[in-house]
């Protein structure tokens, strides 16, 4: 049911994507988290499950993920990716989508829905990052190592640092163009962008999720389903999912369709040396399909 990978140029960079599912199916953009590619564990499994329910799933390597070209612009990395997706859909001739994402992908899809409300029919999010601990943790994953490296040794130093959720070196290995693109950006501009993106990961009283002011959630006017964060999942707190629920009029919160400790168990397995991804996400497919297939007269979910 999967089609071969394809490429489209957006804002001077190549985006790698594929479709899974019937050509006449309702389009669902499925977006994972981290700097992980569309081929990361568990992503295709969920896509196939949604496709089995008649959906046409668009999987994409977001800029700075997988085999797509790196991009360094925008208010935050999520805003850059949201703009990329908006232009990409226009080039592909796709007018409306269900925006679905987990972890960092949830943030990307929330921002996309705010920036392109005319393109989104429904919003579906899970494993949402927020709160002081997880927001500051993201700074330590995505920008602080980069800032230290570029200030100490330029772009070449950035290419040598490891990444807990994917690294720039990984991106260059997956796509040789990326090393040249980073060198062309140069240390000064790279540092400037990292400083701007860093601001999103400074916890603020009026930001339930990193880099998005609470007042901006009023722009989300589509039926929205939120999966509650795990009780002990400090990276995707239950509190954050409830805060987002309170900010989107009419949104619905459901209990996790996977084990309560799925994220913690994933961490234990990774620390033991096992290669694991987002395999538990496929457990959400029945709930996700039921939500997507609900008839709506517009506006948010009652």
Each model region followed by its residue ranges:
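Gly/Ala-rich beta-loop-alpha elbow adjacent to hydrolase catalytic centers
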Residues: 101-105, 109
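Conserved alpha/beta-hydrolase "acid-adjacent" motif
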Residues: 233-240
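Conserved HGGG/HGGXW glycine-rich cap/lid loop of the alpha/beta-hydrolase fold
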Residues: 13-69
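Flexible "cap/lid" loop of the alpha/beta hydrolase fold
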Residues: 110, 114-115, 121-151
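Conserved acidic catalytic loop of the alpha/beta-hydrolase fold
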Residues: 80-97
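Hydrophobic, aromatic-rich cap/lid helix
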Residues: 178-213
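Short beta-strand/loop motif that positions the catalytic acidic residue
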Residues: 220, 226-228
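Catalytic active-site module of serine/aspartate enzymes centered on a nucleophile-bearing elbow/loop
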Residues: 250-302
């Amino acid at each position: 049911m999967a089609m071969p990978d394809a490429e489209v140029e957006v804002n001077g960079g190549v985006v790698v994507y594929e479709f899974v599912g019937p050509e006449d199916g309702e389009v669902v953009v499925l977006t994972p988290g981290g700097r992980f590619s569309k081929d990361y564990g568990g992503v295709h499994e969920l896509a196939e499950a949604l496709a089995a329910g008649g959906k046409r799933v668009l999987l994409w390597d977001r800029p700075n993920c997988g085999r797509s070209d790196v991009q360094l612009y925008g208010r935050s990395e999520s805003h850059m990716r949201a703009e990329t997706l908006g232009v990409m859909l226009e080039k592909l001739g796709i007018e409306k989508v269900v925006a679905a994402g987990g972890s960092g992908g949830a943030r990307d899809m929330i921002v996309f829905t705010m920036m392109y409300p005319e393109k989104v029919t429904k919003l579906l999010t899970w494993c949402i990052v927020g709160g002081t601990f997880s927001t500051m943790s993201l700074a330590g994953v995505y920008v602080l190592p980069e800032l230290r490296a570029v200030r100490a040794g330029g772009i070449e130093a950035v290419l040598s640092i490891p990444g807990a959720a994917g690294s720039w070196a990984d991106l260059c290995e997956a796509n040789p163009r990326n090393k040249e693109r980073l060198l062309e950006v140069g240390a000064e501009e790279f540092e400037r962008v990292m400083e701007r993106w860093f601001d999103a990961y400074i916890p603020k009283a009026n930001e339930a999720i990193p880099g998005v002011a609470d007042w901006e959630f009023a722009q989300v006017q589509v039926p929205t389903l939120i999966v509650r964060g795990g009780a002990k999942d400090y990276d995707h707190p239950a509190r954050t999912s409830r805060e987002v629920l309170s900010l989107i009029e009419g949104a619905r919160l459901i209990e996790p369709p996977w084990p309560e400790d799925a994220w913690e168990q994933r961490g234990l397995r990774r620390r033991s040396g096992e290669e694991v991804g987002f395999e538990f996400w496929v457990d959400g497919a029945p709930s996700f399909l039921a939500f997507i297939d609900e008839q709506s007269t517009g506006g948010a979910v009652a």
